[in-house]
Regions:
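C-terminal cap/substrate-recognition subdomain and adjoining C-terminal extension
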Residues: 76-209
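Generic secondary-structure transition motif, activating predominantly at the C-termini of alpha-helices
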Residues: 24, 39-47, 63-67, 77-81, ...
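Active-site neighborhood of HAD-like aspartate-dependent phosphohydrolases
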Residues: 1-48
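Short, compositionally biased "basic patch" segments
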Residues: 34-62, 111-114
Length: 209
């Protein structure tokens, strides 16, 4: 089994951001009802006031403001499916697993089109809450552990935050250049490990508040 992060790895740039902009164009009221709040949350996150998991949850908030969400998701992927990296399509296998911090409702349609399995963040768009921890950093490795540690032949990601699950794979690859260049995973020297530790910090081990 090969495992892939999604955003920045086999899709560029970020499906939540891309779909959020798509929805704002289709439903212009979001420019006034959601985007000002989104920029406020971003400021709090950059200043270190809001932890990563809460920033992500707040960023998913627009999903509950779009009445025709499922229809818009299909139309979005009709147009954006072409952004899936060609290098991935050339090596795609039926037992691939996409593992992503993005919400399930966004990842599910494209995973179905690709014919592969997926696991993503469980988010209740009606109530605006996470139903489980954000599928990010250590949570990806925890998911693998909880499934009996299946063999991961190859793992691909664009982020050092995925180092915990990269260490679970027989071989890990680092994706850069707008999801176009694939290289070996960086050596985990002290400087790199310091970066890893800062990236995997979500603020708390429980993401449900």
């Amino acid at each position: 089994m090969n495992v892939y992060d999604f955003d920045g790895t086999i899709y560029y740039p970020d499906c939540v951001l891309s779909f959020g902009m798509w929805c704002a164009i289709k439903h212009p009221r979001l420019w006034f009802t959601f985007l000002p709040k989104a920029f406020f949350y971003l400021t709090l996150y950059i200043l270190g006031i809001m932890p990563r998991y809460r920033f992500e949850r707040k960023g998913f908030g627009f999903l509950g403001m779009v009445d025709d969400l499922d229809e818009q998701l299909e139309k979005f992927w009709d147009k954006h499916e072409k952004r899936i990296s060609k290098w991935y399509l050339a090596q795609k296998k039926p037992d691939d697993l996409i593992i992503s911090a993005s919400p399930e409702c966004i990842i599910a349609p494209i995973a179905k089109r690709l014919g592969v399995s997926y696991v993503a963040t469980e988010y209740d768009r009606e109530y605006g809450v996470l139903l489980n921890n954000l599928m990010y950093a250590k949570e990806k490795a925890r998911y693998i552990f909880d499934r009996g540690f299946p063999v991961i032949n190859e793992f691909y990601s664009d982020s050092l935050s995925d180092t915990p699950i990269a260490l679970c794979a027989e071989k890990a690859f680092y994706v850069t250049h707008r999801a176009q260049k694939v290289s070996d995973w960086p050596e985990l020297d002290r400087k790199t490990l310091d970066r890893v530790h800062s990236k995997i910090d979500t603020g708390t081990d429980i993401h449900l508040d």
